[in-house]
């Protein structure tokens, strides 16, 4: 099994790259955002945890993610404590995901985790791919999700710089180009990786 980790700022195109790995190389994708979304929606222990830390973010047992995001943006000590618990749960689910697909002899696994580097989720990766694009395109993508420019800038400031990400990366994919070009970049990486794996 080869494990890829995707690192990139908000709106850089990580999910787009992950979808290409899934479609063209049958990779299994661990989508941390989806995992957390499901925890907030269905996990009673997590919903209870949210209500303990941020009572105004839960109404009748339903987590208001927009409200919860505002607590993240304030960057207070409560959020740091809360986030550490959520990260521990996600880490366990990531390990279970990898073990499951290893038993099934899956060839490729891709970790699509926003804080891959910052939260040390990358230690199990064989290769790290830095996904990048222009700041303008990042902002356009984020605004389409319903976030404001202020929220985009605030989140972006809390994330690692592009230069810091590059230090961890084995490869870089630029997503501000055509879909055909993005696929070409991925195919080039896969050729490189498969050649390396065959040599080892």
UniProtKB/Swiss-Prot annotation:
The record's SUPFAM superfamilies line, in alphabetical order, gives:
P-loop containing nucleoside triphosphate hydrolases
Disulphide linkage map: none
The chemistry this enzyme catalyses reads: 3'-dephospho-CoA + ATP = ADP + CoA + H(+)
Q: In which pathway does it act?
A: Cofactor biosynthesis; coenzyme A biosynthesis; CoA from (R)-pantothenate: step 5/5
UniProt subcellular location: Cytoplasm
Q: What is the recorded name of this protein?
A: Dephospho-CoA kinase
Q: Name one GO biological process term.
A: coenzyme A biosynthetic process
Report the HAMAP family cross-referenced here: Dephospho_CoA_kinase
Keywords assigned: ATP-binding, Coenzyme A biosynthesis, Cytoplasm, Kinase, Nucleotide-binding, Transferase
Task: Please list the GO terms describing molecular function.
Answer: ATP binding; dephospho-CoA kinase activity
Q: Which GO terms describe its cellular component?
A: cytoplasm
Similarity comment: family membership? Belongs to the CoaE family.
Organism expressing this protein natively: Ehrlichia canis (strain Jake)
């Amino acid at each position: 099994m080869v494990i890829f980790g995707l690192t990139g700022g908000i709106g850089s195109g990580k999910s787009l790259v992950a979808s290409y790995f899934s479609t063209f190389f049958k990779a299994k994708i661990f989508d941390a955002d989806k995992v957390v979304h499901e925890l907030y929606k269905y996990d009673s222990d997590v919903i209870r945890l949210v209500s303990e830390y941020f009572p105004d973010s839960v109404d009748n047992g339903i987590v208001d993610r927009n409200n919860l995001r505002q607590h993240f943006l304030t960057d207070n000590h409560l959020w740091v404590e809360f986030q550490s618990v959520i990260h521990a749960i996600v880490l366990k689910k990531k390990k279970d995901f990898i073990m499951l697909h290893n038993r099934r002899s899956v060839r490729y696994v891709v970790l699509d985790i926003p804080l891959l580097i910052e939260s040390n989720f990358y230690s199990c990766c064989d290769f790290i791919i830095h996904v990048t694009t222009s700041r303008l395109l990042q902002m356009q993508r984020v605004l389409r999700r319903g976030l404001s420019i202020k929220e985009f800038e605030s989140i972006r400031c809390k994330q690692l710089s592009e230069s810091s990400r590059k230090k961890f990366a084995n490869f870089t994919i630029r997503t501000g180009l055509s879909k055909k070009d993005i696929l070409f970049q991925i195919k080039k990486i896969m050729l490189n990786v498969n050649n390396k794996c065959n040599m080892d």
